């Protein structure tokens, strides 16, 4: 049985986020606003079905998917692109590949203790985020 990501997570670390957004061609005003936010993550997992809600005072983003099945992801509100996304298990980690206009786009997510780690990648730029489980 894979690890269970279910829970409510508060952001502790947001390293290199503005550079990540720049690599996605997000305009400077939105980058500055987004860099000030400390979004929470609410994750509901039922086997290989996952709903990941990224919640902030500025904008919310919901990702609803089945692990191992490719789907079209609408990134309106992030960088206004669509991509074909596949999330797969790699041991106890979730690996995401987002195929679209930007090369090398995706993320890896895993748990260490009571912390959720998220590494987002695009065109060689890496953003590292850490969240603490609060419930």
UniProtKB/Swiss-Prot annotation:
PROSITE patterns in the cross-refs: FABP (PS00214)
UniProt: all-trans-retinol binding residues: 41, 63, 109
Effect upon mutating residue 30 to A: Decreases cellular retinol uptake and impairs retinol storage
Gene Ontology biological-process annotations: fatty acid transport; lipid homeostasis; retinoic acid biosynthetic process; vitamin A metabolic process
GO molecular function: all-trans-retinol binding; fatty acid binding; retinal binding; retinoid binding
Consequence of changing residue 31 to A: No effect on retinol binding. Abolishes interaction with STA6 and the ability to enhance STA6-mediated vitamin A uptake
Impact after mutating residue 32 to A: No effect on retinol binding. Abolishes interaction with STA6 and the ability to enhance STA6-mediated vitamin A uptake
Record region (Important for interaction with STRA6): 22-32
Pfam families: Lipocalin
Domain of life: Eukaryota
Presence of keyword Transport: yes
GO CC terms of this entry: cytosol; lipid droplet; nucleoplasm; nucleus
Main localisation: cytoplasm
Subcellular location field: Cytoplasm; Lipid droplet
UniProt note on tissues of expression: Detected in nearly all the tissues with higher expression in adult ovary, pancreas, pituitary gland and adrenal gland, and fetal liver.
Keyword entries, A-Z: Cytoplasm, Lipid droplet, Methylation, Retinol-binding, Transport, Vitamin A
Covalent S-S links between cysteines: none
Function: Cytoplasmic retinol-binding protein. Accepts retinol from the transport protein STRA6, and thereby contributes to retinol uptake, storage and retinoid homeostasis.
The protein's assembly and partners: Interacts (only as retinol-free apoprotein) with STRA6.
Description of its domains: Forms a beta-barrel structure that accommodates hydrophobic ligands in its interior.
Family: Belongs to the calycin superfamily. Fatty-acid binding protein (FABP) family.
Identification of the protein by name: Retinol-binding protein 1
Species for this entry: Homo sapiens (Human)
């Amino acid at each position: 049985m894979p690890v269970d990501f279910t829970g409510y997570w508060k952001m502790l670390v947001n390293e290199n986020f503005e550079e990540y957004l720049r690599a996605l061609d997000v305009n400077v005003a939105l980058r500055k606003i987004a860099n000030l936010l400390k979004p929470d993550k609410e994750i509901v997992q039922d086997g290989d079905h996952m709903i990941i809600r990224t919640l902030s005072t500025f904008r919310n983003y919901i990702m609803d998917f089945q692990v191992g099945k490719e789907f079209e992801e609408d990134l309106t509100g992030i960088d206004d692109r669509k991509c074909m996304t596949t999330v797969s298990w790699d041991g106890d980690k979730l690996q995401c590949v987002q195929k679209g206009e930007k090369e090398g786009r995706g993320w890896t997510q895993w748990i260490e203790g009571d912390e959720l780690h998220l590494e987002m990648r695009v065109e060689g730029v890496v953003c590292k985020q850490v969240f603490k489980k609060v419930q």
